């Protein structure tokens, strides 16, 4: 799979990519997820530079919608049993060629979407079958700034343009 000249969008799995993949519940059954500020800042920088983002999650959690709202991501697909179909929908909705989309996932249920994307990426702690299929493996684990690292790697390779010299709003 050869990377496109320019990545115009990044689609992300949530659990295991933007979070550490753990499930945390409070004493009254409330759910918690921990997101890393490096990822929040990377997404903010990317959005300010014109990069589109989507969240594609197998889980149906209101926390995913809340995170998306916080960082300004409008394309959110939760409860996905077919992440490849969600990726196709995201690309069509935004008039994107799939070759201009990067997908980052961490487990075997992400492989279908990864096969469609122009660039497939995974955090360091992804499942071995995923690590064998991707173009980019970050040194950071999911939930520890892996998305920010991916954005920085793509920018350094000339695959996207990110502005780092002005403050970003998160």
Identify the residue ranges that each predicted region occupies:
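Mg2+-dependent phosphoryl-transfer enzymes with acidic/Ser/Thr/Gly-rich catalytic loops
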Residues: 29-33, 69-71, 75-77, 84-170
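Alpha-helical substrate-recognition element adjacent to the catalytic core
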Residues: 1-85, 170
